[in-house]
Amino acid sequence: MPAPTDTISLRQELYDLRLQAGRLQQEILATTDPDALDALLTTAGEVEGRIATIETTLRQTEQADGATARKHAVTRSSKTTGLDANVRLRMMHVPTAIYHLLDANTDPLLEVELVNSKSDERRVRVTARIEGYSADAVTTVELERRGGAATQTIYLLPTLFPQAVIPLHELTRATVTVLVEELIFASDNNKQFSTALRIEAHVSLPVWMLARNSAPLAVRDPQSGEWVDLSRYFGAFVTPNQPEVMAFLRKAAGHHPQQRLAGYQSDVASQARAIFDALKEDADITYVNSLIAFNPDESARGQRVRLPRECLSEHQANCIDGTLLFASLLEAASLHPAIVVVPGHAFVAWERSPDSGRWEYLETTMIGTNTFAEAQEIGGRKAEFWEKQAAGGDASKFRRWPIKELRTAYGITPLE
């Protein structure tokens, strides 16, 4: 059945705005003129503001349409057994690369709400799996008699089989299966023992498995329509301990006046410049001005990513690839880098002194064509503009993720 006219109109308007935003981002990436950059950023900020407004209106319209469609739904289990099981997916796209870092309490794959409307206590077992890709996630709960304690919500995140997801190089369809069973007990000489299992719900839900080299920026919660930010997990793609990264760091040291990179025991700017010069002169990397890609009408935003060692071996990088490579080299040099994510783009930052909260920025796509100072100026202007935009109420317009914080506060470790 086609979507309602209002919804279609909003989607079309959003589609056109996204195309306009994409064109502006391409112009922003291509310009190295500070004055032209400021004008383009101002226009881009206005377009992003309109996009945010349309997205909010569209989400509210879609939720209203969905509520109307659900008005006459009847849950059979609550009428027949007094037990209601509501299964809800929390993400339609499974980010296989960083899935092992997710927490079921904050980023579950699905949730199951159990409601006991009878006067008896109930014991219920919930099992969920991604068919062919995960182990079973099993949770058993006790539901109190009807009342406030008779409702429980279970959050599930089945563990993926590594050997099953490693071959995933393309977006792949999969099925999530959820089984809700009541454990029926009998008594014998004051002892309880299980006599049967009664199936309360058996649900199959379609999902998408993201490719292993796809880094998630955000996923849409199918229930609320809200975007769940996952950009912090870009930190997993910062891999300072890889042999290829360490070997290139030794080359970078050769570009430093003291022939070594000593972290915060030495001048920070000269070390960042040495890494910049090494990438410019020794890596032979072609920097591609491609955008962080997503479709706002889909349920995931992300970007295919080359790991730092792949950038060095393939001699190619886009904005996020170059950012992750530069951040890996900075972290390997015992400095404190950060990944900066703004609409359609990413660049690198580093802390001027340890734990100071004062940052320098650099546009990595300019490494092959411009000087260190020019790349710093453009990176700084972009950071200043988008940080001000974010201060207006939309935090997604400027995300600065210090790698030290990601490692220590979020437990996000390198993928390799």
Protein language model annotation of sequence segments:
Residues M1-L19:
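Short, charge/polar-rich alpha-helical segments
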Residues I8-R11, D38, E310-A317:
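Short, solvent-exposed segments of well-ordered alpha helices
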Residues L10-E13, T43, L168-E170, H315:
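Amphipathic alpha-helix face/heptad-repeat signature
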Residues Y15-L41:
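Short E/K-rich amphipathic alpha-helical oligomerization segments
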Residues L24, L40-G66:
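Amphipathic alpha-helical coiled-coil segments
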Residues P34, I54, T61, P108-L110, ...:
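Long, low-complexity, intrinsically disordered N-terminal extensions of eukaryotic proteins, enriched
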Residues A64-T75:
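Coiled-coil termination/hinge junctions
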Residues V74-E416:
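A structural boundary/capping signal
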